């Protein structure tokens, strides 16, 4: 019944297996990839005809982690997988980015790639396995795909690169100072196509070395996919790239000068209007047959690309008149929103971000339910890109894949410089509102986020800045590297290369390459040029932070105290009774973890002190020989019980009440009476022994021996 083909190899410390022919046989291509005991199934289907009038490539990538893969049942009311999590969205983008440029130009049939995590060993991250499975499924499906690709994750510890470090090693790099890198690289046999990383101030040489190491390590995986395809690949889809050379010649003749004049306008809004008008004039000058040609959009885009790119390599000029390595004018302002905890407005040319920081307590941490376990995050970064930022009308709703991806890039860049939670026990939420956009808005979020957190009083290890780089690579090998690219330069260039970091090194690197031929030398030069741009931006940012910002008066204060773990139950009380009383009486928030660390939070310092004193009274031990003020709570024939230390009671024996014989303790005491007592010690059973007669009941001072003898 089944015609199963399996290919296996040793990859690093694990075994990698590719299998096809048993499951989902009606899909155009299905491969189950397994690394260790982590398995991902990738399914590829594609339409045999292009939709009429479609002028873009409709590729859709879905990635889903099934809870059963790790032996778990989903939470929530419905107990089933619902909308994609942030991890699933980011992984789908991770797969999409390297495969999209490898489809044959002109192919616009709908393609669907679905990756499903079937098994997770909690050691090997399924995102790399999914990328390999998707590449293999595309390669055997017959779709016009110029792959295969493969991906690998690289760590960096003690000066050594590590292939595919475990999930635990990568879980929270901020708390694991030995592990300084989480880098994912995808590429073909000959070229790197995509880089995504989180780093801890690594040098340009160390980052480039990691990329090179990863590209070397994926070579045997690509060979394994090719070996699988040689035996199982379907007949290639009969597709011939459209020849629109005659149409392009007509478009070029009709409007090259108009398009060149339009792109010479430096103001974005005016340029967009002029480019649109030039296109309308070009279309109007064409024949009716040419106007109805489905490749007209491609011909116009090619003309734009030629005009935009021509001056970059030949003359070193860009559409806004800047030099290739020149950063746009920068303006920074902090503290502009009075009631927020921290705020910054970062403007670079026609790109602007209003970034706001809010400080919260442990109750505000984000709870993340993942396949490899549940955990909390105390640093959140949310990126919003409303339509008005580019002068358009559009949908407003929940964040899309792009917003989630850009927010995560900025998160990676900034979290490397955050203080340790033990030093700064706050939850930090940064929100970047992109108010204007003309390229590299994610890097504006990095710069604005750094300024905003410092304005809020967050003790960052160092300021962070980011810059977006571009590349124009001609067929003869000549190239131009662009610093701080515009939106048009991003769309029509050959590489999008975002670098963020401090003066000391890189904290985040993201690279998407659209063409082959990007050599290590080009990447090295691009990183060097990016460093110069980053240092320039850091210098501009420093002008707005002449002195350390004070902690916002509107932010909660957090006091941390450590209690013995065996005292935690006493602080919480039966059914939470004690801790609820502390919160109600003091007005402060109280958070206790299993290690005995208690965080007390309030904007009111008196509330914090009240809660601190109440907790201290519960967990502190009375000191032998010390004098305390107490209250009589019960009188018995042999003495009186006095509450003297929080909830702790002790016995004052009738012989320790006064220096004379009493018939009954009630002769001098009554319940509710305030008295001064000295802790004499503890009896054999641990019971507290108190004395009143050795303490002056008026002053609270201990009666010295001489005075007692005189009496």
UniProtKB/Swiss-Prot annotation:
Essential cofactor(s): Mg(2+)
Annotated ranges, domain KH: 556-615
One Pfam family recorded for the sequence: RNase_PH_C
Compartment(s) where it occurs, according to its Swiss-Prot or TrEMBL record: Cytoplasm
Signal peptide region: none
GO cellular component labels: cytosol
Enzyme Commission number, as recorded: 2.7.7.8
Catalytic activity reported: RNA(n+1) + phosphate = RNA(n) + a ribonucleoside 5'-diphosphate
UniProt: Mg(2+) binding residues: 490, 496
Gene Ontology BP annotations: mRNA catabolic process; RNA processing
Transmembrane segments: none
Entries under SUPFAM superfamilies matching the protein: Eukaryotic type KH-domain (KH-domain type I), Nucleic acid-binding proteins, Polynucleotide phosphorylase/guanosine pentaphosphate synthase (PNPase/GPSI), domain 3, Ribonuclease PH domain 2-like, Ribosomal protein S5 domain 2-like
Annotated HAMAP family: PNPase
Family named by the database record: Belongs to the polyribonucleotide nucleotidyltransferase family.
Role played: Involved in mRNA degradation. Catalyzes the phosphorolysis of single-stranded polyribonucleotides processively in the 3'- to 5'-direction.
Name of the featured protein: Polyribonucleotide nucleotidyltransferase
Organism: Ruegeria sp. (strain TM1040)
Organism lineage string: Bacteria, Pseudomonadati, Pseudomonadota, Alphaproteobacteria, Rhodobacterales
Gene name, Swiss-Prot/TrEMBL: pnp
